[in-house]
């Protein structure tokens, strides 16, 4: 596949949301004590919730994610009933003992000092308010809670296979999001998340031997040391309190281990990179090598999409694979270097999409994962010269279609029939949405669209239609048909060179749309004298044309092709004897499911 993405570097200034848009705001203050031997914790949470909606709210909901790690939970049942369970989960939850399960319970809850009743529904807490929250008003919800860190199975947990003591993600009572669609109260089965934008002030008290890293800026480095300060104040007792503040984020994650090495690196962009990894001689060299490469990735992503808006990013060894969070990622660390670099690149790329653009991941997992895969692949092309960086996404997509497992990308993340369909749709087909869009509107227009999208919708919760509208403005091409067919259906792209006939001084080419999804067609012509040309056939529904491909001087724009008509006839002003080859989509960016009928070779 040819590299068609040429980045036009520019400075991006984050804009404010459009008039009429609203979103809720939350401010968390938490003080938590962790028993590292029993893997239990207790805490207080003061939550200031501001209702910026036009609606009066009579109740609120919290997520209690750790309750999923109990036998017969919805996550457990779903994992044991799906045909292709995640190998990291399988039936492991069902086998957890009482001291291995996870739980997260509210013990008391008050609204502005008034005691509230509440009801736990597995991974959700339902809370009727004593005083309804009217539009524009704020209320303070004060909670005492307790939890137990589950045996490490998926993302969060204790004592991972690599020996990381605490991977603490989705560990606190997290207020559910309320937006123009209403409350988002999906039970947790191990898939995606959605959160309220806000500020976090978190104090974590635990064994002083443990090193802590994660979301937020440490407020007391001299008191804790451990790589945050050259000199550490002497403290009495067996514990330390770590005080973190994270402004304008929608989650808070952390990890801790007594054997963490903590390195820092000042990146060119003014961002401090933190790295936490086990003191394991087998991995230290790779983790040292990772640090300058992460700085290069950060610089590339900044120039490609827009500035990373925080002054810190942290890579932590932990969890069970790789997972993105606010200002940090948790990844497994005992990998080959290409794998360690690759997962770090992908998770860092999420910072622009999963975090700053903050898609509703449950509804639009393909934007969250797919856009990160796309940006990661751009980095592979530019930084490492891997011109085949996009190929795996196309291959995986074609395979899931061939296997008959594809489901529409509009499927809720929890509702896919198979993990294969979810994974391939979210990661691969989501990435192809953007790379194939370069075939439709041109690579420069795609990069321009992403930059404008980031500039206009940072720190909000944009939707697929928001991106479509940005891309239409950037390109001058109508794209409703593209968003509809690629994400809301399983219509496939399949075009065929049906016949090629000599017509004296001309050559007649009959093209056929075999699949259900219409596309513009680039028909490449290779002449026997070595010259090349492209006959560009716009799709009528585009109501516009993309610019000529870079490096192609002979670019002919033909009459557009109406989607409902399966046959299109083209006349080339050259006899067949002068033509060596005809090829649909010479760039390889169109995800045609059958490439065998895309090429005509003139053997005469």
Language model segments and positions:
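Solvent-exposed beta-hairpin/edge-strand motifs
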Residues: 62-114, 169, 205-210, 526-539
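Non-catalytic accessory/interaction domains
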Residues: 221, 349, 444, 457-604
């Amino acid at each position: 596949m040819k590299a068609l993405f040429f980045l036009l570097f520019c400075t991006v200034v984050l804009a404010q949301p459009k008039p009429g848009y609203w979103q809720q705001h939350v401010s968390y203050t938490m003080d938590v004590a962790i028993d590292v031997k029993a893997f239990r914790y207790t805490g207080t949470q003061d939550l200031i919730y501001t209702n910026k909606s036009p609606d009066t709210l009579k109740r609120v909901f919290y997520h209690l994610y750790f309750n999923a790690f109990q036998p017969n939970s919805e996550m457990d049942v779903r994992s044991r009933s799906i045909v292709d369970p995640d190998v990291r989960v399988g039936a492991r939850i069902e086998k957890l003992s009482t001291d291995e399960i996870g739980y997260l319970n509210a013990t008391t809850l008050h609204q502005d000092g008034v005691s509230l009743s509440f009801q736990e529904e597995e991974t959700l807490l339902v809370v009727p308010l004593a005083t309804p929250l009217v539009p524009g008003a704020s209320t303070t919800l004060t909670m005492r809670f307790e939890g137990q860190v589950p045996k490490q199975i998926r993302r969060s947990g204790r004592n991972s296979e690599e020996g990381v003591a605490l991977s603490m993600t989705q560990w606190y009572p997290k207020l559910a999001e309320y937006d123009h669609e209403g409350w988002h109260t999906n039970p947790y089965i191990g898939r995606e998340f959605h959160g309220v934008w806000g500020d976090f002030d978190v104090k974590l008290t635990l064994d002083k031997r443990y090193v802590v890293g994660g979301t937020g800026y440490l407020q007391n480095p001299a008191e804790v040391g451990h790589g945050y300060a050259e000199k550490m104040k002497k403290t009495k007792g067996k514990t330390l309190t770590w005080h973190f503040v994270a402004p304008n984020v929608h989650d808070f994650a952390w990890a801790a281990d007594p054997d963490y090495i903590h390195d820092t690196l000042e990146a060119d962009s003014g961002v401090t990179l933190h790295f936490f990894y086990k003191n394991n001689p087998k991995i230290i060299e790779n983790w040292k090598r990772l640090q300058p490469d992460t700085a290069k990735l950060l610089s590339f992503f900044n120039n490609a999409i827009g500035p990373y808006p925080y002054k810190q990013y942290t890579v932590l060894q932990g969890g069970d694979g790789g997972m993105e969070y606010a200002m940090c990622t948790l990844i497994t660390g005992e990998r080959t270097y290409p794998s360690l670099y690759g997962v770090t690149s992908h998770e860092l790329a999420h910072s622009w999409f999963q975090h700053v653009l903050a898609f509703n991941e449950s509804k639009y997992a393909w934007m969250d994962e797919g856009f990160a895969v796309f940006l990661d692949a751009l980095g592979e092309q530019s930084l490492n010269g891997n011109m085949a960086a996009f190929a795996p996404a196309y291959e995986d997509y074609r395979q899931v279609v061939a296997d008959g497992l594809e489901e529409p990308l509009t499927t809720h993340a929890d509702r896919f029939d198979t993990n294969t369909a979810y994974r391939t749709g979210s990661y691969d087909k989501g990435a192809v949405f953007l790379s194939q869009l370069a075939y439709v509107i041109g690579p420069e227009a795609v990069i321009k669209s992403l930059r404008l999208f980031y500039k206009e919708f940072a720190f909000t919760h944009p939707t697929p239609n928001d991106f479509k509208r940005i891309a239409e403005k950037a390109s001058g091409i109508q794209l409703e048909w593209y968003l509809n067919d690629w994400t809301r259906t399983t219509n496939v792209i399949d075009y065929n060179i049906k016949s090629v006939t000599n017509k004296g001084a001309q050559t007649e080419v009959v093209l056929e749309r075999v699949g259900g999804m219409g596309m513009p067609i680039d028909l490449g012509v290779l002449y026997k004298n070595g010259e090349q040309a492209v006959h560009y056939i716009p799709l009528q529904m585009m109501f516009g044309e993309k610019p000529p491909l870079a490096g192609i001087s002979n670019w002919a724009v033909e009459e557009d092709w109406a989607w409902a008509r399966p046959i299109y006839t083209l006349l080339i002003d050259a006899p067949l004897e002068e033509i060596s080859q005809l090829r649909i989509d010479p760039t390889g960016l169109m995800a045609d499911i059958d490439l065998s009928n895309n090429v005509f070779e003139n053997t005469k």
